[in-house]
């Protein structure tokens, strides 16, 4: 600053310093005349110009330095604020992470609970469907029971079936005092008429013995009177009935032939 002040001082205020100059130098200065005057002015102008330029540069530097410093400080502050914001964001993200995990857990739990509820609803629907089908079956059975003829069919299915075959009874059959034998004979006839019964009887049981037929030489004349009960005639009628049954005639003919031979002897 002192140098600048010295440079800025005008020429008329500069102190004069007494110097001992030789007479030769004074004569040279006076001899040159105008040329010396111009040369001195040029020399004097140059340091003033440099001083003004330096002062302007220093002034600009002084003005620009605080501006740059302020800008630099603002940049630093901005950087600090940005860093703080980033740190806050990271902290918020870290704080939000467990909340996201909790949300996932909640969603999983809600989905599992919803799936459980759906499973229970499906089970209830299945139960209702089964119950409805059972109710329908019960109603159908009740309706069938109310229908005519349904009860008889169920009874027939439960009770074993017994078939009865009508036996042709001749008009000449006479009542006798042995009803048990007649019953046995009728049962045997019915069994013989059943399919497959005759073969089993032939294999398991021995040859059936039947009463011989009584052959009369003189035919009996028809009379209007009631016939007298004779056990031989009764047996003959039963044998005739047996002969009419299928599967019985062959055995009776063979036995009759044998009996005729024995009677001839």
Curated annotation (Swiss-Prot):
Biased composition (Polar residues): 16-28
Sequence repeats: 133-153, 180-200, 231-251
Record keywords, A-Z: Acetylation, Phosphoprotein, Repeat, Stress response
Keyword set includes Repeat: yes
Biased composition (Basic and acidic residues): 1-14, 29-47, 69-79, 96-105, 129-156, 173-204, 227-265
GO biological process per UniProt: cold acclimation; defense response to fungus; heat acclimation; response to abscisic acid; response to cold; response to heat; response to osmotic stress; response to water deprivation
Compositionally biased spans, kind Low complexity: 160-172
Renumbered residue ranges of the record's region Disordered: 1-265
Phylogenetic placement of the source organism: Eukaryota, Viridiplantae, Streptophyta, Embryophyta, Tracheophyta
Protein name per the record: Dehydrin COR47
Keyword Protein transport listed: no
Region ranges (3 X 21 AA repeats, Lys-rich): 133-251
């Amino acid at each position: 600053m002192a140098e600048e002040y010295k440079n800025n001082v005008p020429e008329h205020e500069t102190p004069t310093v007494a110097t001992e100059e030789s007479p030769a130098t004074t004569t040279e200065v006076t001899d040159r005349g105008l040329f010396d005057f111009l040369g001195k002015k040029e020399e004097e102008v140059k340091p003033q110009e440099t001083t003004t330029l330096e002062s302007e540069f220093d002034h600009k530097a002084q003005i620009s330095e605080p501006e740059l410093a302020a800008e630099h400080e603002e940049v630093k502050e901005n950087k600090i604020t940005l860093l703080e914001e980033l740190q806050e964001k990271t902290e918020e993200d870290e704080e939000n992470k467990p909340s996201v995990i909790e949300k996932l857990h909640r969603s999983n739990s809600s989905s599992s609970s919803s799936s459980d509820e759906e499973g229970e609803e499906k089970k209830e629907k299945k139960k209702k469907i089964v119950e409805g089908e059972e109710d329908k079956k019960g109603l159908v059975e009740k309706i069938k029971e109310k229908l005519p003829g349904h009860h008889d069919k169920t009874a027939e299915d439960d009770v074993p079936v017994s078939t009865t075959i009508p036996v042709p009874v001749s008009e000449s059959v006479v009542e006798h005092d042995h009803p048990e034998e007649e019953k046995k004979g009728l049962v045997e006839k019915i069994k013989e008429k059943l399919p497959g019964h005759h073969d089993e009887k032939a294999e398991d049981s021995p040859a059936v013995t039947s009463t011989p037929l009584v052959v009369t030489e003189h035919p009996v004349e028809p009379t209007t009177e009631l016939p007298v009960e004779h056990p031989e005639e009764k047996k003959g009628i039963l044998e005739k009935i047996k002969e009419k049954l299928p599967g019985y005639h062959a055995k009776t003919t063979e036995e009759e032939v044998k009996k005729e031979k024995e009677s001839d002897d």
